[in-house]
A protein has these predicted regions:
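Structured binding elements
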Residues: 111
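PLP-dependent aminotransferase class I/II
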Residues: 9-11, 54-57, 65-66, 118, ...
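Conserved coil-to-alpha-helix start sites within the AMP-binding
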Residues: 99-104
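Phosphate-binding glycine-rich loop
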Residues: 45-92, 106-108, 116-118, 140-150, ...
Length: 385
């Protein structure tokens, strides 16, 4: 691949001849300032206020979830989702090694042990085939609970991720886990605006979590959301994330261990403004992805594109290079020339704090780790929009 030509193409695409092009920077072009000023003028800048309730309502409507509970970040959302799935200290939670560390950290926050199972190359998400093989070889049912025969620990949950906003084979994963009485928690942190078979990601399992970090498709500066269609889970999620405080006009009564995971109203105000612009952001990002796909096909480079029945938000565009040497050369030259690119995350099982946890053969994840590069994916300025 001609890297210099690719840098020139990206600069032309973003209309930036010399300036630094980040991977994904936020765009503020709507009611952000107006809503922030309202928070300040009314003094409702903390965890109670109009925009907290409105943001939850609007995200629920957009995703089709019956309940949406806002949190201070996506990691907290996953932590609470695991707790509400019944995960306890000493349990095992199956997940993928190819993920951002928040996925694995949330498992450890819940006191559980991550078990790393391989991914599919075409989704970069948890592989149902690898999951099925792992469970056939290692799991047994004891009553209505699943146990790991080798460790004698309960396998309570499975947390696949929709990588870069692309759908994993979530229906197959849920079907397998249902047979083994394993709860599924959907890590849809990167997937706001992504659909599979017309259904928003994060709403297939009983509970899921999304993120509104500063680099996401829409941002609240920092933030996350728990999605569920289960009334009991939805109400309990709200209770736990607000310090488990029993409603009362003046008394402070708490009935269980809760968490200060509340999103401030001032952050939720940003979220409401961003959600109003989401459809435009998605159309803009899709046009960018289509331009990339056409360009890289001519270069003989694989562009990570959506599959059949999938409508991806293209949060972060990715290309798959031929080997690690080619990947490293691309990373070095693009970043040196002010066009940001990055490798995919280092596999979780390679990190010192996770290296001794159980894992399967991870050949696909290792193959992708050596080849995947993310390229600029933020909303472009097109005709002043």
């Amino acid at each position: 691949m001609n890297i210099a030509e690719t840098i020139s193409f990206i600069r032309d695409l973003y209309g930036e001849k010399e300036a630094f092009i980040p991977l994904h920077a936020p765009t503020f072009a709507g009611n952000e300032k107006k809503y922030l000023e309202e928070c300040i003028d009314t003094t409702f800048v903390s965890s109670v206020g109009k925009f907290v309730d409105l943001f939850e309502q609007k995200v629920a409507e957009y995703t089709g979830a019956k309940y949406a509970v806002v949190c201070v970040n996506g990691t907290n959302a996953l932590h609470i989702a695991l707790k509400l799935s019944g995960v306890k200290a000493g349990d095992e939670v199956i997940t993928q090694p190819l993920t951002f560390i928040a996925t694995t950290n949330a498992i450890v926050y819940a006191g559980a042990i991550p078990v790393f199972v391989d991914v599919d190359k075409d989704t970069m998400g948890l592989s149902p085939t690898s999951l099925e093989h792992f469970l056939k070889e290692n799991a047994e049912l004891r009553g209505n609970e699943c146990y790991h025969k080798q460790t004698n620990r309960r396998i309570k949950a499975c947390m696949p991720m929709h990588t870069f906003g692309h759908a994993c084979r979530i229906e197959e994963i849920i079907a397998i886990c249902d047979r083994y009485h394993i709860d599924v928690v959907e890590d849809a942190a990167e997937a706001i605006g992504s659909y599979y078979k017309g259904k928003h990601l994060g709403t297939f399992a009983k509970i899921g979590g999304i993120s509104f970090n500063g680099n996401k498709t829409i941002t609240t500066g920092g933030g996350g959301m728990i999605l569920t269609n289960d009334e009991t889970i939805g109400k309990h999620a709200k209770h736990l994330t607000t310090q488990a405080k029993v409603p009362h006009a003046w008394e402070f009564v708490h009935d269980e261990i809760g968490y200060n995971y509340r999103m401030p109203n001032i952050n939720a105000a940003l979220g409401v403004a961003k959600l109003e612009q989401l459809d435009g952001f998605l159309a803009n990002k899709r046009a960018t992805a289509e331009a990339y796909k056409a360009y890289f096909e001519k270069q003989g480079i694989t562009f990570f594109a959506e599959r059949e029945y999938e409508k991806c938000n293209y949060w972060l565009n990715a290309i798959i290079l031929n080997n690690k040497e080619e990947r490293d050369a691309f990373l070095t030259e693009t970043n040196a020339k002010g066009v940001m690119s990055r490798p995919i995350w280092q596999l979780m099982n390679r990190l010192p704090m996770f290296k001794d946890y159980p894992k399967t053969d991870l050949s696909n994840a290792e193959w992708l780790e050596a080849r995947v590069v993310n390229i600029p994916s933020g909303v472009r300025k097109i005709n002043n929009d």
